[in-house]
A protein has these predicted regions:
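Unchanged
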Residues: 49-73, 78-142
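Conserved Nudix-box catalytic region and its N-terminal flanking loop in Nudix hydrolases
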Residues: 26-69, 147-152
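Residues that recognize and position ribonucleotide moieties
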Residues: 12, 42, 116
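Exposed loop/turn and edge beta-strand positions of beta-sandwich/beta-sheet ligand-binding modules
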Residues: 14, 38, 90
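Acidic, metal-coordinating catalytic segment for phosphate/diphosphate chemistry
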Residues: 1-17
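A short beta-turn/loop motif at secondary-structure boundaries
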Residues: 10, 36, 84-86
């Protein structure tokens, strides 16, 4: 839906941030930011939603643009909306997670200066509130892995 938008009330920007884990859950894929804010800091791949896409489409597009991973399945974790989470202005992010083998072809693209797998036990400092986002993503993965289907 393209066009001119006028609103009576101010609107926050909306982003998607994606954690890609190895299947054994020992590592997560991070990008090193090429732009301010947090230039040269490690972060989850992600970015701003376009007006003509859904949040899931945004997550899939941003993941491809920054890492070269073409996701076919991402799971939504939830929204993060602290007022000061982004120094550029009011931003709400929706977090997603997925899985990829370490053998998956990755490449730092778009505004990612570098890309690397990081052990969850040895994470570097992360940009924005990405430590908090990653914690919630890990909780969600563990919860989903513990779900059982009642076949009665």
């Amino acid at each position: 839906m393209k066009g001119t938008y006028t609103y009576e009330y101010p609107r926050p920007a909306v982003t998607a941030d994606i954690a890609i884990f190895t299947p054994d859950m020992s590592e997560v894929l991070l990008i090193r930011r090429g732009n301010e804010p947090y230039k040269d800091c490690w972060a989850l791949p992600g970015g701003f939603m376009d007006m003509d896409e859904t949040l899931e489409q945004c997550a899939i597009r941003e993941l491809k643009e920054e890492t070269n991973i073409a996701a076919d399945c991402l799971w939504e974790v939830g929204a993060f909306s602290k007022v000061d989470r982004d120094p550029r202005g009011r931003t709400i992010t929706v977090a997603y997670y997925g899985f990829a083998d370490r053998a998956t072809s990755i490449k730092a693209l778009d505004d990612a200066a570098d890309i690397a797998w990081h052990k969850l036990s040895e994470l570097p400092p992360l940009a924005f509130d990405h430590h908090e986002v990653l914690e919630k993503e890990l909780e969600k993965v563990k919860c989903n892995k513990n779900l059982t289907v009642n076949s009665k």
